[in-house]
Amino acid sequence: MQFEDQPVVLIAGPTASGKSALALAIAHEFAGQVINADAMQVYDVLQVLSARPSVPDMQGLPHVLYGHVPPAEAYSVAGWVKDIRKILAQQGPMPVIVGGTGLYFMAAEQGLAEVPEPDPAIRAHYRQRSAESLYEELLKRDAAEAERLRPSDTQRLSRALEVLESTGRSLGDFQREAHAHALLKGRRVIRIYLEPPRDQLYSRINMRFSQMLTQGGMEEAQELLKLGLDPQLPAMKAIGVPELASYFAGNMRLEEVENAAQQATRHYAKRQMTWARRNMIAWEFHIAQFSESISREIFAFIRNKG
């Protein structure tokens, strides 16, 4: 497949949904490269607890943006966009971007607006007001932006007014500029969303964390905690790390750690699914599980679109 005809495949879904297996199948079929879009799998110390693919899991295929960030760094969506832009510029194998961090996919397709930080006094002024008064003011000052937002969405209404007051420009202006220079602008994009039935997903989640505890997760957390890092860093908040920190401090039993981390993972998966229903409804494929028949359909679609 020539580069100019090469599509970009996006695979999203909640944690433990089987995304990696689908990404591998597509990468094998099209001699592609698998690119990480999971905010925790970027950290070098989080192999087990982030469910990052191991070397055998990678099956000899190129995998990039996995385990390349030290835990002392607060990796951001902006850093991910910068890194992946460099990868795509190399015009290498077909990109198969896979992960559960919805904001990464949104930034790749819609761009990442570089909005100046609002003045703290302006922010404080708007954040103490009601949604009704915020909406009324925004409707008068920036009707187009107001019509895009729910009248009850206090946070977004406040944000729009903070930016308008601080910069003199509509938040929509910044977002339109970002969209014009979005990472995947002008590329052929194929989007696949994978979401198993909830009972199956939760069963997988529970089983997976139990396996993590016996397959190196405890030792991994212990080594991370020895670094003495700020507990507010993203890597320190990875599911399993705070719970195991409590265990090592003598504040939780291992059974409690397991239950708490499983519950936290289920809640995280639920948030991912809620986010996807709002933002990924137009994706070409919505599938419940990876199967041979589904893979054939996806392969044919990629060939036809590619």
Residues covered by each model-derived region:
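Phosphate/pyrophosphate-binding catalytic cores of soluble transferases and nucleic-acid-acting enzymes
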Residues: 1-306
